[in-house]
Amino acid sequence: MFASADQLICHAMGDYVVQSDWMASHKTKSSSAALAHAVSYALCFIPLTCAWTSFGWSPSTWLPSSVRWSALLFICTTHFIIDRWRLARYACWAKNFLAPRHIEVLHPDGHPEAGKSAGWIRNAPWSECSGTGYDSSKPPWMAVWLMIIADNCFHVLCNAAALAWL
């Protein structure tokens, strides 16, 4: 299983070109907006889910019976779930528990406390990170982009699995 350039193009078309402003603005608040986006997103994958002839793609393979409906349904469903509940923010928050945060106090050489650590601090609670998965110590623009990148990784992984195994 791997992501092909074709798959990445379909993903970009579905998530950035075909998605309307209304879908983008409301998909985390409204299931109808999330569903409209997920369906339009999945439709971008039709060329990759159609049967291929030994000579490559052919218009005759656009018959409904030749479409891998299970792959399209999986792509649509996972896209709906990931976007509707903005699952990437949970992953961004949870990953910070893989290694606890440590504060190191830097004192000038010769100071009696030089080289000593202040100790461990707990990770930020969900209430401080629920928007993007990152707390306020991360610049807002960076927190949003890191969440978008994580979101894209989840979509590409789900799509690759669907195209490889369904």
Language-model features, listed with the residues they occupy:
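Hydrophobic alpha-helical transmembrane segments
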Residues: 1-166
